[in-house]
Structure formats: structure tokens, C-alpha cells
Regions:
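Conserved ABC transporter NBD signature motif
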Residues: 57-69
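Helix-to-loop junction immediately C-terminal to a conserved catalytic motif
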Residues: 49
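Hydrophobic anchor residue at the start of the ABC signature
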Residues: 76, 140
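Short helical segment in ABC ATPase nucleotide-binding domains corresponding to the A-loop/adjacent helical element
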Residues: 89-97, 107, 111, 215
Length: 257
């Protein structure tokens, strides 16, 4: 699904969240949105999902204006949002049941998808009985089971430890390669953006506008991101992070004199 944002702006009352934003995201492309907290990245996702309407401008999927939620566009949050009274298999199957697919068939497909995310044998466990990483694997299975054309990810791994996060990034990349959805990823983790994305949009503080766009599509990437050191530093500088670190280092040096 091609996602198109045309002169999109968003206000909440007097709060100007997004300045005019115009970008096309090609079918099958993965774009990461990076920027300060509260700058409007998640709001862009919600508009693509049909949960929010732009104050001005248009958001479209394959040329059709997005006017509300649709199974073709799946939104996944940092919180796994699994129902605690349902097993992992039942949670995953629910995505198909909402589309009026037979309960037995939905359960069979859910078992297949749990196997795809390495949760075979945990189908009948409840969310509280497994780790946070396993819950997020189940949430990934639920996001992919309906084979969405667009996958909208709002910091899906932000609450996980570094090792689990890297493992799930690998799992996500494998699933994307299998299904080929368009993906928009909101993240505060620059390394995650560099590893997963074809393009990265770096946003300013609110009202959000794109400070710079980075094209990474021709790179075959591993978690060793040393070849992206210059790009990483530039992104951090755009976010003001290195400037703060350099100032902190100067202050520490001054204390030792």
C-alpha cells in the first residue's frame, strides 16, 4: 500500500502539533520516524490508521482518502495490549475473528503464526505467564496474521531490554520480508531505525517538520552498524543529543581541573 501525506497539518485546540507534512511512502517500504517526544510522530501514525483526522491536508492509502480504521492498516503499540483473560493463541486469533473468519480456522492460523514468531508450545499460556518479549512476539503475530497492506508501529520494542529488542527486530525484519507490507515505524532508538529502515525522517520539536531525510535502501544491514557511524552521529546532532553530551563532557573536564 502506498501511503501519501499531502500538506498534512494537525492541531489540538491551540496546540500546533504538525506543520504541513508532504511525503509519499512507497508500497513495501519501511520508513522510520525519529524525533523528540511529543513532536507528533505518533499522531502521524494515528492519521494513517484512520484514528485521527488531519486539521488540513489529506492522508491516502493507494490513492484513496483514509477516513477511518481498516484491517488493511494495522497499528501496533509499545504496550502489547493482549487481553489477560485470553491465551496467546486466542489473542492472536481474535484479529481474524473480528473479520468474521470461522473460529476454528482462526485458531489454526493463530497457531501457525505463533510458530512463525518462535512461540510454538506456548499457545495455551496466558499473557501473565510469559515474559515481556514473548508477549510482544504474540502481539507481532497478531499484527501480521491478517496480512495487512500497511503496518504502523508505535515504539513496539521500546519497553524491552536491549538483547530482547534486537531479537525482535530480527523477527520483525524476517516477517516483513515474507509479507512485504508498507511499514511506518515510530522509534526513539536511532540504531533501531538504522537497522530496520529504508528511509529515516528526522523531525523537529513541535510543530513537527522534517529536518532531514536519510535514504538507506541499498544497504544490507546487520546489527553491526559501524558503517553508519557518520549517519548515526548526524541524526543525533539533529536531535541535539551530541550537543548535550559534549557540553556535559566539558563540564566534567572542568570539575577535574
Amino acid at each position: 500500500m502506498k501511503l501519501s501525506f499531502n500538506n498534512v497539518a494537525k492541531r489540538f485546540g491551540d496546540l500546533h502539533v504538525i506543520e504541513e507534512f508532504t511525503r509519499d511512502i512507497a508500497s513495501g517500504e519501511l520508513v522510520a520516524l525519529v524525533g523528540p517526544s511529543g513532536c507528533g510522530k505518533s499522531t502521524l501514525l494515528h492519521m494513517a490508521a484512520g484514528l485521527e483526522k488531519p486539521s488540513s491536508g489529506t492522508v491516502a492509502g493507494d490513492g484513496q482518502a483514509i477516513r477511518g480504521p481498516h484491517p488493511e492498516r494495522t497499528l501496533m503499540f509499545q504496550e502489547n495490549a493482549l487481553y489477560p483473560w485470553l491465551t496467546l493463541q486466542q489473542n492472536v486469533a481474535l484479529a481474524l475473528e473480528f473479520q468474521n473468519i470461522d473460529k476454528k480456522k482462526a485458531a489454526e492460523q493463530a497457531a501457525v503464526w505463533l510458530d512463525n514468531v518462535k512461540l510454538k508450545g506456548f499457545e495455551h499460556y496466558y499473557p501473565h505467564q510469559v515474559s515481556g518479549g514473548m508477549r510482544q512476539r504474540a502481539a507481532l503475530a497478531r499484527a501480521f496474521i491478517s496480512q495487512p497492506k500497511a503496518l504502523l508501529l508505535d515504539e513496539p520494542f521500546g519497553a524491552l531490554d536491549a538483547l530482547t529488542r534486537m531479537t525482535l527486530q530480527d523477527a520483525l525484519r524476517d516477517l516483513i520480508r515474507q509479507q512485504g507490507p508498507t511499514v511506518v515505524l515510530v522509534t526513539h532508538d536511532v540504531d533501531e531505525a538504522l537497522f530496520l529502515a529504508d528511509r529515516i525522517f528526522v523531525f523537529s520539536p513541535r510543530p513537527a517538520k522534517v529536518l532531514k531525510e536519510f535514504n538507506l535502501v541499498h544497504h544490507e544491514k546487520t546489527h553491526d552498524l559501524s558503517e553508519f557511524a557518520a549517519t548515526r552521529r548526524e541524526i543525533l546532532c539533529l536531535l541535539g543529543i551530541h550537543a548535550e553530551q559534549d557540553e556535559f563532557a566539558k563540564n566534567i573536564e572542568g570539575v577535574g581541573v
